């Protein structure tokens, strides 16, 4: 069981909303969009959990080529769960993330309140933009 699997199971067991993305793809597209031969393709192994969702992300963790800890099967985190603002933290285990979840007391209720606040703020901004256009 991977670190991401352990974290996903914890989130499910504690009713914390999340979306998980797993992407195992071979890419053969060059920068100019021309299809390359098989010898120039590369493999993208990307796994991500977003809390509560991709669109409204309070925090997320990834394990993909190039992320801090990927080669060791460890997680990289970004967002509200990290110790330093606007930074990523790597080489984390699922247990490291779980301890932070418990420290911040994330729950369905707290995340729902955050999400509602975020959506209301976007609605207010959209209303103000419409007033500016009139």
Report each predicted region and the residues it spans:
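Intrinsic low-complexity, intrinsically disordered segments enriched in polar/basic residues
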Residues: 1, 13-14, 43, 121-122, ...
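Amphipathic alpha-helical segments
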Residues: 3-17
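Compositionally biased, intrinsically disordered low-complexity segments
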Residues: 9, 19-21, 32, 37, ...
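Short, flexible coil/linker elements and helix-boundary hinge sites characteristic
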Residues: 14-15, 27-28, 33-34, 48, ...
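Amphipathic, interaction-prone secondary-structure segments
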Residues: 18-74
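Mixed-charge, Lys/Arg-enriched low-complexity segments
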Residues: 77-134
């Amino acid at each position: 069981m991977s670190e991401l699997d352990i974290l996903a199971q914890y989130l499910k067991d504690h009713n914390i909303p999340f979306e998980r993305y797993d992407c195992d793809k071979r890419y053969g597209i060059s920068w100019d969009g021309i299809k390359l031969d098989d010898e120039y393709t590369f493999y993208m192994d990307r796994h991500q959990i977003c809390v509560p969702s991709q669109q409204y992300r309070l925090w997320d963790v990834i394990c993909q080529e190039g992320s801090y800890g990927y080669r060791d099967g460890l997680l990289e985190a970004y967002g509200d769960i990290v110790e330093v603002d606007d930074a990523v933290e790597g080489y984390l285990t699922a247990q490291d993330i779980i301890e932070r979840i418990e420290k911040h007391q994330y729950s369905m209720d707290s995340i729902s309140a955050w999400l509602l606040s975020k959506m209301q703020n976007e609605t207010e901004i959209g209303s103000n933009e419409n007033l500016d256009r009139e």
